[in-house]
Amino acid sequence: DKVERNMKAFIAAGGRARWDYLIFEHSECDVERAEQLAKEWGVERFMKKKTGRFINANSEKKETHQAKNRKGADMQQLAKPKKAEHQNLALLKQEEITKTYGSMMDYYNQATVKCKVAGKDTKSIFITAEGLVMPCCWTAGRMYKWWHSDPKVEQIWDFIDAAGGKDGISAKVNGIEGVFASGIMKDIQRSWAFNSIKEGKLGVCAQKCGTEFDPYAEQFK
């Protein structure tokens, strides 16, 4: 009820609302009803979003996704939608990628990276709650994974440390231009030419912006 009231109030005040409807097994029966409500309320855009969550941290397919809260406790278990029209096509392509390259890791090692935030028409940066400047939410999101007792086991910290640690990429300490001067953005971009993740290619870039496997983009098709 609160969400509905807030959305209606936002639209009534002149807001341009967009509703991204994540489709899981438990919610796919309500897609048409939600789309009708969006029209009735004056939502500018209703997106049937085909989630790409059904890949684990090792890039293996899974049929369910266990949602957890910020303390790591299990919440609702999410399952793939049943209807093919609601499924993310990139997940279906995963078998083809594996046959071609041998494994998803072999694909990531060889993947051509086309950055989603440094393209010709789209340029953006991501500033974390700590005031740290990163290329995107995906690179920033690798900094603190709740399942690591030591967050610095993640590869992204190699680039952060090379830039002077957290202070080196802090907008509060250096300003945004100063963070760019630290070299972290160029170092990440240069890494895409390396032969493998083991040799220094930033893996999260290959996973999220590799040109042949893109669950993110397929969510919106």
Give each language-model segment a name:
Residues 132-133, 137-221:
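Flexible mid-to-C-terminal extensions adjoining Fe-S/redox cofactors in radical SAM and related proteins
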Residues 1-171:
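Radical SAM enzyme [4Fe-4S]-AdoMet core and its adjacent flexible, acidic
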